[in-house]
Amino acid sequence: MRNIGVFSVILFSFLAISLKAQNSNFVFKSFTPIDGLSQSSVIDIEQDKIGQLWVGTRDGLNKFDGHTFKIYRNNPEDSTSISNSDILSIAEDRSGMLWVGTYNGLNKYNPETNRFQRYFHSNESTSLPSNTIWKLKEIKNEIWIGTLNGLAIYNKKTEGFTSVLSDEKNKSSLPGLFVTSIFESTNGDIWVGTDNGLCKLISRNAEQISFQTINYKKNKDIRPYKLHVKDIIEDKNHNLWVATKNSGLYMIKANTTTLISYQNTPDFKDVNLDIRAINFDKHNNLWIGTYSGIFILKSDGDVQHIGKKSSDYSGLNKIKTIFTDKHGSVWAGSYYGGLHLWDESNSNFINFNQNSKSLRLSYNVVGSIAASKDSLVFFGTEGGGITQYNFKSDESIYINSENTKGFLSDNIKSLKIVDDALWVGSFNTLPFLYDYNTKTVRTNNFPDELKNIFIESSVYFTEKENDSIIWFGTFGSGAIRYNTETKNYIQLTTEPEGLYSLTNNRVRTLFIDSKQRVWLGTQSGLNVMALSNIDKEKIPIKQFFFDSELISGVDILTVFEDSNRNIWVGTKASGFYVYKGETFEKVDIQHNGVKVNSVHSVLEDAYKNLWLSSNQGLVKYNLNTKNITIYDQTDGLISNEYNDNSSLNFNNDTFYFGGPAGVVSFQPDQISLNNYNPQVILTDFRIKNESVPIGGDQAILTKDIAFTKAIDLDYNNANFSIRFAIPNFINGSNNQYAYRMLGLEEAWNVTSNTEANYIIQQAGNYTFEVKGANNDDVWNEQPTILNITVHPAPWRSWWAFCLYALCIGTALIALISFLKSKAKLKHKLALESIEKQRNEEINQAKLQFFTNISHEFRTPLTLILGPLQQVLLDYKGSNKVYKKLLVIENSANHLLQLINRLMDFRKLENSQFNLQAAEGNIVKFLKEIYFSFSEYAKNGNYTYTFESESDVINVYYDRSKLERVFYNLISNAFRYTPEGGNITLKITTDSKYIYIDINDSGVGISDEFKTKIFNRFFEVPIHNQPQKNYNKGSGIGLSIAKNIAELHKGTIRLVHKERPGTIFRVSLPLGRGHLQDSEIISDFKLSDDISQYEIQLETLPVLDEDSIEDLITEKEKSTILIVEDHKPLRVFIKNLLKHDYNILEAENGKIALKLAQQNLPSLIISDVIMPEMVGTELCSKIKEDIKTSHIPVVLLTSRSSLIYKFEGLESGADEYISKPFNVKEFRLRIKNILENRMRLKAKFSNAKHITPSEITISSIDEQLLKKAFKIVEDNMANEQFDVLAFSQELGVSRTTLFNKIKAWTNFTPNEFIQEIRLKRAAQLLETNKINISQISYQVGFKSPKYFSKCFQKKFNETPSQYQNRYSEQF
């Protein structure tokens, strides 16, 4: 047997030659003796009922299970072997028996016994007429056999043969002796083909069988060969098709008996006349196997040819048989050419390289791909110049330095289409422009300095900003922005003294996104800049994937923007990332154990799939479902490795990816999915690495393992292995399997191997289950099952145990004699136990005594230390006495420390803690803890839910202690629940208590342990669930949880559950009556320590609380309102910002709201957790109030949990900063928010057209501004329209109108009205249809003269000059 790892030969890109000039690609996967086939001449093919393929060759019968070929040959010493190794025909009957015809004898193969029964010609009348068997067919429970000397019919009941011979004198006999084909049509007619014609059975009785020979009209163009029929088949319309040797193809229409030559059909004239086999595929196309290859007659009449010259015996040429399997794949057997498989999925990917017949590349290494608008595709190779392919004409031409003048290099790194020309970037030469229409290189006179830059470093990437501006990414000199018209350029490098700074000068990729941002990926980091800043003296460049301290970063290979405008980044060896607002998140690309770390290029199809090229093949990543599929060479790719940015989406339907081995092309919507998932077959059973024969000395197998349902094994045979396979022949190396041995294991073992090994040590009944998935991850619905019984060893048999019982009984009788002495010993031990318990009680009493004494000592000791320390501070006496006082203080402190340690130990022993409870929303608290396990739940595929009857339930609780309880309970739930299980945190209440249930579907807890689980150091034994090896803990978690719950005057208990799993319920009293005043703290929030911010500053701000200078406001400064209940932090932030901004302060949200309404600050910075009014509520009120809705709000809190962040953003916050924050970043983010507001105001004045959403930050402002625009538009020609009318129509006071307009646009209401009127006037002037005086009145000006004055002030030119300028443009 030979093992098939991957299909060894891919017959790629057989160009289908159509008589109507169609171009198609048929990709076959071939099997030869190298892959395990017994011989390369394949004569016949059959598939059995369990899916295995049987292949007959000139040297052996082959059984192929999708993984392994098993060969059957004649063995002269074995009468149960096949009669001859030269196979001519194969057929399976209804009972599953396989009939095999050879050059010497007929064979019936029993797959259950794995044996052949032979039949030969003899002198008996009921034997075969010949030993050479050419055709086999089961008809009506009989086997019809075509031989070299007539027809034989085998009766299964009598086990005898009836011979039908040819007789020239009898017209009702066979027309020829050599029977080559037998066929039964759907209407029950039986047709027999011979070497001298075709006949149809017309009658049959016990004495005679009569046939009608079918007449045919000879074709004058065909040489007068006799009609040698080779194959017969029926189409869906019940027409018969007849293949003949040297006479071509014939057809018999349904319900007729006339042979019509199909060779007369115009599109069929060039089809070879020597047809050996025909068959239909699942699309009703007729496959015609000839001695010059395969012709495919499509349902629309077109004919395609696949093959080679008739003199070529190799490969897919001299076809002997064609077979369509259960999946619909087509198999072809050729003479000395092997076995060939065609499936639609073979053509999923089309490959091109230097050896391709269509689109032959000039060089294999393809580094860049580009396409023009008129169906030209350009492949830039790294050694052969450019290959240009014309899709319309199917022609390729090569462009290189040898045939094109001025073509500077054949090592092409980048291509970009601009204005019907191709920018070419190459290795160590200048970039140049190739005109593919004139087939010439255009000259481009770069400045000398720029030429030197290009020569020093290669151009690795070219990007188009517009028709005149091109970006070049160089590998050593940074990025170049070049204006082809002015010849000016800007160079971006890492030079610190330059205006611009990149992370690295080696630019691999360059991309301009839809937001007009330029992304520059380098060998060390990613850079992004806005094109709007390109003309500024200093351009801000943001850096990602770069450590400025180490001056090192990630190697960026490609940048891509999807249809949702998300930015994706592929790196070298560091993974795949997506841009989320301000940061990049890593996307794990992993499937079936294959992990992708390098992404070279990205494309998106019409179905929201990203296609990534990597070093492991091509990856399909669905943006919606996150499903991942990886295609590699076993799926038909030319290579698993690809080059950076070497990809193309051609016409939005065809993708190209280039690599070091060539180019792969495919249409994403045409990739075929294999849904065929046959049952797994058991192929071998081995004991101690030896195959178990059928029968044998131990009689373990009575029939083949594929048909065996149960096996009995002795104890010494329990070291065994089982081999299996799934008969999926499409990329079979990608098949997967999952198996388990019930009784030994519950979990499935997933593998691509086809063998499972076991050593069973315990006698018993076991069940082996195995299921499989095909190459496209389609799994079986039902597993294949094998029941295995392992018998015990003799010393563990029933009679052995009887003997053991007898011995034990005798021993028991002997033991009775000293039971009394044992009872005495037991009594003694009981007394010792009582004594031990008494000693423990004494020890506890002693410990309690020492604790009480410690309490008594601590109070006077504290009273001693206080005055003593005051004495030391005030003491002015002798130094000698002062030293003695210091000795007293040190000794007292040491004694206090020892007492505290003793008390802490006692507290731990008794689980007595001081409760520090505060009222809080326990739902939010529990949801925080719930979120902590969300990622773990997702990774383990748990169904993890949170349920609460209310969003707010206020309870007095100690957060730090109660947190320990629920973390313990939830972590236990995950620990003892298998992956894929259910875990729920549910909150309910009644009038007195709140109940928190942790419900899981795990292994549960046995009744015998339920009363012990809260004991300290007790653990549920591992055998509570023997099939799982759970991690063990310390055994104190539940005990501590119980103590904490009781400390809250609550309980924790195990709730009875009908289904498997566990429910722990924590009950806590509502209200505060159950707690003492000492157990309640007034402020639950921890104080903010400003020292963590001070250490970030080189010079500390002076922490003055209030000064006269702080009360003085400067009009040119923005005003910031700081809302923080923690005064030291509030003062710190104030002093941090007061040099740049006017500062207002508030200690809670209630005060802040009033200050905001009175002073209308430029920005509000607010804590979240505060008394009176929390920050999120303050934010909501600010955003809901029309007076203050325009003010940006920044939420500042020490909580970093997602729940608080979501709540803050939902309330309308513009920014969210977690404490502790970075001082530098804090200042920068405040500055950016305020500068952004100023830019929005400036935008109103500078832009001709603008929408309210572009200059507002809240929906209320946007609606109000829309209304303001509409009011001014409606009153455009109204000269009487003033601020009073404006405020009345808008529905706000004049003060509010002034504040809102000023906040939005930096204008007064009058200026706002005039600004809109002047912009409308400019629009009217641009049309050049109305005179200036009319326009001035139409836009509400009383005087054309005043209008001209205002217009010139706004646009720096008179209305007439403005109008003339636009008229000149037209």
From Swiss-Prot:
Gene3D superfamilies named among the record's database cross-references: 1.10.287.130, 3.40.50.2300, Histidine kinase-like ATPase, C-terminal domain, Homeodomain-like, Immunoglobulins, YVTN repeat-like/Quinoprotein amine dehydrogenase
Principal location listed in the UniProt entry: membrane
Residue numbers carrying 4-aspartylphosphate: 1167
All copies of domain Response regulatory, residue ranges: 1119-1234
Keyword Metal-binding applies: no
Keywords noted in UniProt: DNA-binding, Kinase, Membrane, Phosphoprotein, Signal, Transcription, Transcription regulation, Transferase, Transmembrane, Transmembrane helix
Keyword DNA-binding among record annotations: yes
This enzyme's EC code(s): 2.7.13.3
Membrane topology: Single-pass membrane protein
This protein's GO CC annotations: cell surface; membrane
Location in or out of the cell: Membrane; Cell surface
GO molecular function, one term: DNA-binding transcription factor activity
Residues that span the membrane, as ranges: 799-819
Post-translational events: Autophosphorylated. Activation requires a sequential transfer of a phosphate group from a His in the primary transmitter domain, to an Asp in the receiver domain and to a His in the secondary transmitter domain.
Signal peptide interval: 1-20
Stretches assigned to the Histidine kinase domain: 852-1072
Domain HTH araC/xylS-type residue range list: 1266-1365
Residues in the DNA-binding region annotation: 1284-1305, 1332-1355
In-chain residues carrying the UniProt-annotated modification Phosphohistidine: 855
Described purpose of this protein according to its UniProt entry: Histidine kinase probably involved in ulvan degradation. Ulvan is the main polysaccharide component of the Ulvales (green seaweed) cell wall. It is composed of disaccharide building blocks comprising 3-sulfated rhamnose (Rha3S) linked to D-glucuronic acid (GlcA), L-iduronic acid (IduA), or D-xylose (Xyl).
UniProt-recorded name of the protein: Histidine kinase P4
